[in-house]
Amino acid sequence: MKRIFLFILTNIAVVAVLGIVASLLGVNRFLTANGLNLSALLGFALIMGFGGAIISLLISKPVAKWSAGVRIINDAQNADEAWIVETVRKLADKAQIGMPEVGIFEGAPNAFATGAFKNSSLVAVSTGLLQGMTREEIEAVIGHEIAHVANGDMVTMTLIQGVMNTFVVFLSRVIGYAVDSFLRRGSDNNSGPGIGYYVSTIVLDIVLGFAAAIVVAWFSRHREFRADAGSAQLLGRKQPMMNALARLGGMQPGELPKAVEAMGITGGIGKWFATHPPIEERIAALQNAPA
């Protein structure tokens, strides 16, 4: 979850900064100088949309290291760290990707992988994960993160985020222009976009941005099932990943974690933005997957 949440958050920040810079440079005035130029707007939306997503991808490793406080293991300080590095190396070789950077961060059980390229990624695990799981379960979690890298999930999510960003930028400005034109009907002042355009665009950027985040989260949930299966394939068996998922959910295999039980009964908007499927669904998918 850290991996996708950080990517989405960074992407939103980058697109917002690009939008502010574009406004200061008079891009909005250019787009509406002689009516709304849809071709120019589409080009602008593509640059903004994919530019923000690609920049977010390229800076994902340093942002993740900084935000999570990751300590990179350059020289193992103990047997546990040496085992983690060797496990990552072994699974990376099986997945036929370059050796990732390996790191540890303080916190509750969690792990993530990130990076723009398969052969220069980062895999990090938390101290809570190392203290609360068996080595077999930790290996399964690392396999899950290696599978994300091998499957090119960060690049896939970048493309999806780029498409959604383009949609948000384009549609918000088309609607903003329509609202501004309606508010200024009969006015002789056509020197450029008015306050209606700017207010509408800002509001729609936020609203449509949330809608886009729901779509991105939906794709992310489906990639999690594939990464779970990838871990099972790398380890040659499904049970370690199932046990790790059960442990993360605070349950024994076959039982539902209390948090998921509550969410399943009441539903709510949180499910729409979740980047990971409920744990019991992931375990069931692994159980039903071919051996």
UniProtKB/Swiss-Prot annotation:
Transmembrane segments: 4-24, 39-59, 159-179, 199-219
Record-level Gene Ontology MF annotations: metalloendopeptidase activity; zinc ion binding
Binding site for Zn(2+): H144, H148, E224
Keyword presence, Transcription: no
A single GO BP: proteolysis
Single GO cellular component term: plasma membrane
Family: Belongs to the peptidase M48B family.
Residues forming the catalytic site: E145
EC number: 3.4.24.-
Localization annotation: Cell inner membrane
Annotated protein name in UniProt: Protease HtpX homolog
Swiss-Prot/TrEMBL cofactor(s): Zn(2+)
Membrane topology category: Multi-pass membrane protein
Keyword Hydrolase included in the entry's annotation: yes
Pfam families in alphabetical order: Peptidase_M48
Encoding gene (name): htpX
Keywords linked to the UniProt accession: Cell inner membrane, Cell membrane, Hydrolase, Membrane, Metal-binding, Metalloprotease, Protease, Transmembrane, Transmembrane helix, Zinc
Organism: Polaromonas sp. (strain JS666 / ATCC BAA-500)
Cofactor stoichiometry and binding remark: Binds 1 zinc ion per subunit.
